[in-house]
Every structure is written in structure tokens, then in C-alpha cells.
Amino acid sequence: MIATALRQVGAVGLALGIAAAASRAHAADASPWDGDARSSVRLIADGPDGATLRAGVEIRLAPGWKTYWRYPGDSGVPPRFDFAQSSNVKSVTLSWPSPRRFVDDGGQAIGYEGDVIFPLRILANNPAQPVVLRLKIDYAVCEKLCVPAEGSAELPLAAAALASANEPALAAAEARVPKPASIGDRSTLAIRSLQKRGNFFL
């Protein structure tokens, strides 16, 4: 009887340990938000794609506020992403989702509003060792006036091999990244043909 009770206690302890580990793994798929009432930023992660780790920089903007694309238009400042303090990271490739155009007193601007995720593809120096992604970001947010913003985030990616609730959002952001169009591609706006006349292409 005592042995049965001990087995039951052990089973309960094991179940609680598994639940706690799952909770920690789930929490590790996103860093805390860093920002203020106008905007905030965090890192999110998903499981790996082969040797590449998938993650994203998420910026959340308050209603009426916007931030900018890499080519901001007549006004504005593009975000600057710094991953230099990351651990065991060989390279980080950041993609820019398709932006929208805004017209205001400063002219035409190109950027984002609401919630935007910049997809990341990360290669580790040593895939057998944990990866810690560290971000510092400088960006601008604008309503009627533009103000500078900054943020930082840190996210260990070792637990990202597990399924993540961020996968649909990351997949949607990746789908918004413009794809290069080949000459003659009829599925999207593309150059159908090139003809050279003298020093000019027509």
C-alpha cells in the first residue's frame, strides 16, 4: 500500500514537472514587450527550418501611429536592427513585409501601422549549442509628429524546436515579403521582355 502511494506521488510529480517544462518552453517562444504607449517591440520564434532558425521582430503600434519601411519615402527614418550582441549566431537575415503608402503634411511616406512582423532567418555558429538572439532597435513612430523610439529584446532559441503558437503569424509575415519576379512572369507585375537599342534597353 505504501509502495502504491509512493508510485502515485511520483507520477503526480512527473506530470507536474512535464507541465512546468512545457510552460517554460511555451514562454520561451517570445520575449517580453519593450516600449511605451505609442509602440512596443519584442522577439518571437518558431521551430527550425532545417539548419535555419525562424524568428521575427514584432512591432506593435497604437492606433493612429505608424513606422517606416527601409525606403521611408519623403519623410521618416527606416528602422535600424542590431543583433551584434547575440550569442552563437553566425548570421541573421531580415526580410521586409510589403508596406503601405501614407500621405500627410510631410508628403508621401511608406511604412506600417498596427502590428508588423519582420521575419528573421538565423544561422548558428555551432548548431549543437544554444542560440541567444539579442536585439537593439532604433526606429521612428509618427502620428501628427514623429518621435524617435528604441527597444531591446533577448530570446533564447534553444526551446524553439518545439511547436510554437507564433508559426501562423510568422508564416503570414513571410508571405507578405515581396518575391523577385522573373522576366516574362505573368502571375505578377513583371518585365515581359528586354530589347537593347544602342545604349538603351526598351
List the model feature ranges, each with a label.
Residues 25-202:
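Extracellular/lumen-exposed scaffold segments
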Residues 1-13, 23:
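Bacterial N-terminal signal peptides that target proteins for export
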Residues 17-25:
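Hydrophobic membrane-targeting alpha-helices
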Residues 12-15, 53:
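N-terminal hydrophobic alpha-helix used for membrane targeting or insertion
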